[in-house]
Amino acid sequence: VEDCETDIMVFGADNVGGIAGYQGTATAEHTSIVRNCTSRESVTGYGYNTGGISGSITSYGDSFIENCQAYGDVSSSLHQVGGIVGYIVSKGETAVDGCIAYGNCRGQHSVGGICGYAKCNDAACIVDIVNSIYAGREVEATGNNGSNGYTLATGLVGWLQVGTGKAHIVNCASRVQTVKTVGK
């Protein structure tokens, strides 16, 4: 998906995004890219994985979000909420590069100004969050997750879980004014 813009409020259950609800590849030989796209309105999920650009990236190959902007607030009544992407689980390389999120982010847990939750447990996995900015006012987590009881909210990546893969957060900034949590 390249050079597109949405100017509508988006509502949905799981995997809700301003440009793509679900982004990914079924095999290692394929690549998915969202590039030079803008989402101008709010994105609201009533389930898991809500993002200003992509709700979820689940990929066996490589997936990229490049040079995108999300202007609206991003919220969900459940988990994994991000200003750009709600949820990343990858067996290949996944990158968020050169993106800006301007809206407030709110969810139950794993809430981040750029990415809500990123998991990189496969040896071939690489997750890069680079050259990106969260310029919203507020990130809020209203509950906790069942596995460890933590609320997990931050201006960049709410929960970054790395096993045998590699993850990098490089040259990013958060201009968040308030991070609110309820719980641990």
Identify what each model region corresponds to.
Residues 1-184:
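Predominantly extracellular beta-rich ligand-binding scaffolds that present long acidic/polar faces
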